From Swiss-Prot:
Transmembrane segments: none annotated. Encapsidates the viral DNA into characteristic twinned ('geminate') particles. Binds the genomic viral ssDNA and shuttles it into and out of the cell nucleus. The CP of bipartite geminiviruses is not required for cell-to-cell or systemic movement. A motif (Nuclear localization signal) lies at residues 35-49. It comes from Pepper huasteco yellow vein virus (PHYVV). This is Capsid protein.
């Protein structure tokens, strides 16, 4: 006895659909986003007013583009008594690494590199921490003050360094961090990577001189102090410091 045909065989114009095909909603409806991602990526006009009023601008107030960059690449010998470098030294000129006039704003600072020990020092069993301070000098004059002249320490220990009371109105610690290296035969860590990015928005003012030197600053010089905690074993810091700045419209 022959089997009866299925109803779809008797219906004219009905096409068979393979059951092996992937008929998921993603292929039919296209790529869909979740409600959470749609809420996070909503347009600015749908967000509260505080997001529109207090949004950080790309260009600092009172400045104009383009964004310029100045790099400081050097190997530093970091000792227990400390060291200081000026990272707001920008020469006057017309290039992408020069300032146009006396005033400019350092928007951000990018520090990357490593802390490492010498071949003879890394064999000794010790732990050495390198401390860094990003300091703003509001009234620069002459040459940068040494680490011991700016910071007050207990028992000459850099890890307890704080700005002296009579210099607090002039020197302001904006950021600080440290990196640690360990020497020895077994559990040694002879180098440590350094990578920091900060937004500072520091408005620097120069005098009429064109050279980018600390002695030509008149307001808000940026200084980077560094010191190690071990008294007899110094370390080396190979750093690349990039300063991103904008020229002021008051030039």
């Amino acid at each position: 006895m022959p089997k009866r045909d299925a109803p779809w065989r008797l219906t004219a114009g009905t096409a068979k659909i393979s059951r092996t095909g992937n008929n998921s909603r993603a292929l039919i409806m296209g790529p869909s986003t979740s409600r959470a991602s749609a809420w996070v990526n909503r347009p600015m006009y749908r967000k509260p007013r505080i997001y529109r009023m207090y949004r950080t601008p790309d260009v600092p107030k009172g400045c104009e583009g383009p964004c310029k960059v100045q790099s400081f690449e050097q190997r530093h010998d970091v000792s227990h008594v400390g060291k200081v470098i000026c990272i707001s030294d920008v020469t006057r000129g017309n290039g992408i690494t020069h300032r146009v006039g006396k005033r400019f704003c350092v928007k951000s600072v990018y520090i990357l590199g490593k802390i490492w020990m010498d071949e003879n020092i890394k064999l000794k069993n010790h732990t050495n921490s390198v401390m860094f301070w990003l300091v703003r000098d509001r009234r620069p004059y002459g040459t940068p003050m040494d680490f011991g002249q700016v910071f007050n320490m207990y028992d000459n220990e850099p890890s307890t360094a704080t700005v002296k009371n009579d210099l607090r109105d002039r020197y302001q610690v904006m950021h600080r961090f440290y990196a640690k290296v360990t020497g020895g035969q077994y559990a040694s860590n002879e180098q440590a990577l350094v990578r920091r990015f900060w937004k500072v928005n520091n408005h620097v003012v120069y005098n009429h001189q064109e050279a980018g030197k600390y002695e030509n600053h008149t307001e808000n010089a940026l200084l980077l102090y560094m010191a190690c905690t071990h008294a007899s074993n110094p370390v080396y810091a190979t750093l690349k410091i990039r300063v991103y700045f904008y020229d002021s419209i008051m030039n």
